[in-house]
Amino acid sequence: MTNIRKTHPLMKIINNAFIDLPTPSNISSWWNFGSLLGLCLIMQILTGLFLAMHYTPDTSTAFSSVAHICRDVNYGWFIRYLHANGASMFFICLYAHIGRGLYYGSYMFQETWNIGVLLLLAVMATAFVGYVLPWGQMSFWGATVITNLLSAIPYIGTTLVEWIWGGFSVDKATLTRFFAFHFILPFIITALVAVHLLFLHETGSNNPTGIPSNMDMIPFHPYYTTKDILGALLLILTLLTLTLFTPDLLGDPDNYTPANPLSTPAHIKPEWYFLFAYAILRSIPNKLGGVLALLLSILILIFIPMLQTSKQRSMMFRPFSQLLFWTLIADLLTLTWIGGQPVEHPYIIMGQLASILYFLLILVLMPTVSLIENKLLKW
């Protein structure tokens, strides 16, 4: 009799995706982040669900309901900080996952890559609307500043902003709809994840060499399930350390002050994972130009497969491309740092130079260096 795992309609799907899936034998720990992202998503949905049981999406009670969760609900403080720091872990894994894709040429699986970019945008949207919910000063002013960017759109901008707000300023209607968005988006993300995996399993995984590995595959279980469990334990250890020792390390102290439309915080800034994009936005003196640069800083990922000029898929054997890749990472870290600094000399010019370098590296330098490396292959 055939194993039920291979015949039962539901078990068959799980089997083909996580058990008997043929996997390259040489994928490194950089391939762990996919499963870690799945773990983060499950964790965020569960902690978020328990928070939603006690949270009230109303301007008069939102802030105090979060305080109530932290003070009066059993382990409410723990659930709240797991959720807040879980978002940070989510983005760390997300950026590592994208970085892996860029380095090893995984973007050549175009459908998988494009769904991935869509997932990134959905996660960013979820994190943004979620940050508004505690209704602290940075929640309110972050929502005001970022939604206001849409007013830069010619002709329909102002109407669009007021439509999103549900009034003439960020108020009760805005908070209610942001809570609705924050609740529904993770489930949309889950559906997109299924499509992401569907497309990935059509082609199979890439590997560090970038060379097809069809002749050397091993089953996903037990080899990579074990490896994923190790990654998961390290992720949980990091998250618990962050949550139990320094829960507010990555947060903003301003968010412990209730939202006040009459008092603007000295420095309005988003959470750390958006700072690189915020720095790019601020480095352009024109409002519409800044918004376009902000959008392009993320959407540029869609064009990466079209900018592939190298004859080799992976950067494993391309030292010059590796140098540019790590320059890009350093540039993004610089932008992240500058995004958290006040708008004054020397940060303004540094931000502008870092922003120019970001686009220059992706659009010009990397494709050019790839062509030079192609020439060097003939030597």
UniProtKB/Swiss-Prot annotation:
Name by which UniProt lists this protein: Cytochrome b
PANTHER family: CYTOCHROME B (PTHR19271:SF16)
Binding site for heme b b566: 97, 196
Pfam families: Cytochrom_B_C, Cytochrome_B
GO molecular function: metal ion binding; ubiquinol-cytochrome-c reductase activity
Annotated localization: Mitochondrion inner membrane
Residue sites binding heme b b562 per the record: 83, 182
Keywords: Electron transport, Heme, Iron, Membrane, Metal-binding, Mitochondrion, Mitochondrion inner membrane, Respiratory chain, Transmembrane, Transmembrane helix, Transport, Ubiquinone
Biological source species: Feresa attenuata
Other comments on record: Heme 1 (or BL or b562) is low-potential and absorbs at about 562 nm, and heme 2 (or BH or b566) is high-potential and absorbs at about 566 nm.
Family: Belongs to the cytochrome b family.
Cofactor(s) demanded: heme b
Binding site residues for a ubiquinone: 201
Transmembrane segments: 33-53, 77-98, 113-133, 178-198, 226-246, 288-308, 320-340, 347-367
GO cellular component annotations of the record: mitochondrial inner membrane; respiratory chain complex III
GO terms, biological process: mitochondrial electron transport, ubiquinol to cytochrome c
